[in-house]
Regions:
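Surface segments flanking catalytic/ligand-binding clefts of nucleic-acid enzymes
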Residues: 148-365
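Short gly/ser-rich loop at a beta-strand->alpha-helix junction or flexible surface loop bordering the NTP-binding
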Residues: 1-169, 328-365
């Protein structure tokens, strides 16, 4: 079998091969013509549906998205949705994954999904492709997130790809989405906060464009020679303000390990020691960053779920920045950010982005 899947099918396959490590062996290829060989025709049973994000074999209501190089090459089974590419793509726009399946390169995939995804979901996808985390192929909304992976692209590469295309549907939406995306996100929740910071106020974000993620902050030698870390890496820093943010999720301090070890004295001691070590390192990190002139605010999941919770954290950070000699809070964010109808709309957007069933209104992610 030979098939180039695209759009949501390709996204699921890309997530699978990122987690498995198979993406490292992907090879640039041309756009192949679909071929069911050694079968004589396309049937649902020969499609590796779980690799393509489907829990059941494909059907007309659960299609496989396919890219083809000509009208005559279109597979006509009812469970396929075809995209025709005759021209307009740069060289190297497709990747071969093993013998049977190919996908669009990450840059083309991002543009394709701009035709399907809502802007906020597309923004989160951009953080995923340009970051070191990957969502679950079958359950991207609330499934397991894998961390510590290599990014498959970056913002500059996507922007360059868009500029090289000709009359490709989705480029305008993709170009707009890139304005709210940064490289090097380490987690999905960190990416959510960064997206909200950068999205324009007209799209219910905070409109803070100049931020960086996971950028090394070197400690002064006076601290290093006394045993402090060489550097610290806050999740998010604001370029124009002496503040930043760290997301501390439920797994940050592993309280569950303490509960699990409660009946075994030795295991409990080790779990408590590990928890204490993490807590102490966090406090030292905060002090060392403060010594560099940067206050880093912790963001917890409750701040995102509580109505107006993230608004409070952002306002606290800007008030601290102002007192540290940064710009006035009202010069960073316009008054309309805090209008009641705007805060309600922003909270609805935040809820739609979070990993819970209530966020499904955002559509595919």
């Amino acid at each position: 079998m030979r098939l180039c899947v695209n759009k949501l099918s390709a996204l699921a396959l890309l997530r699978h091969v990122r987690v498995s490590g198979e993406y490292a062996s992907a090879q640039v290829c041309g756009l192949p013509e679909p071929d069911p060989h050694p079968q004589h025709r396309w049937t649902a049973r020969i499609i590796p549906h779980q690799l393509l994000g489907l829990s059941d074999p494909p059907s007309s209501s659960r299609p496989v998205y396919v890219a083809v190089p000509s009208k005559g090459a279109r597979p006509l089974a009812s469970f396929f949705k075809n995209t025709l590419y005759l021209s307009g793509l740069p060289e190297g726009s497709f990747l071969q994954l093993g013998e049977s399946l190919a996908i669009p390169c990450p840059e083309l995939l991002f543009v394709e999904l701009a035709t399907i995804m809502k802007p906020a979901a597309l923004g989160l996808l951009g953080y995923e492709l340009c970051g070191s985390f990957c969502r679950d192929p079958l359950n991207p909304r609330s499934g397991k997130v894998t961390h510590g992976l290599s990014p498959v692209t970056d913002v500059a590469s996507i922007r360059s790809f868009i500029e090289e295309t000709h009359r490709l549907t989705g480029t305008n939406a993709a170009r707009r989405a890139l304005l709210s995306i940064e490289d090097n996100a380490w987690s999905a929740m960190e990416a959510t906060i960064a997206l909200l910071l950068k999205k324009p106020v007209t799209e219910h974000g905070y409109g803070i464009r100049r931020i960086h993620l996971n950028e090394r902050q070197d400690n002064p030698w006076e601290l290093v020679r006394r045993g402090c870390a060489n550097a610290r890496v806050p999740d998010i820093v604001l370029d124009d303000c002496p503040v930043g943010f760290n997301y501390d999720g439920h797994g940050h301090l592993d309280l569950e390990s303490v509960a699990a070890a409660a009946e075994n004295k030795d295991e409990l001691g080790r779990a408590l020691a590990s928890l204490r070590q993490k807590y102490v390192d966090d406090r030292r990190r905060d002090r060392e960053l403060a010594a560099q002139g940067r206050i880093v605010m912790s963001v917890v999941s409750e701040d995102l779920f509580d109505h107006g919770g993230l608004d409070i954290v952002i306002l606290e950070a800007l008030m601290a920045s102002e007192r540290l000699g940064g710009p006035r809070a009202k010069d960073v964010l316009p008054d309309e950010v805090w209008a009641p109808e705007e805060t309600r709309a922003r909270q609805r957007l935040i809820w739609s982005l979070l990993p819970w069933e209530g966020g499904e209104s955002l559509g595919p992610c």
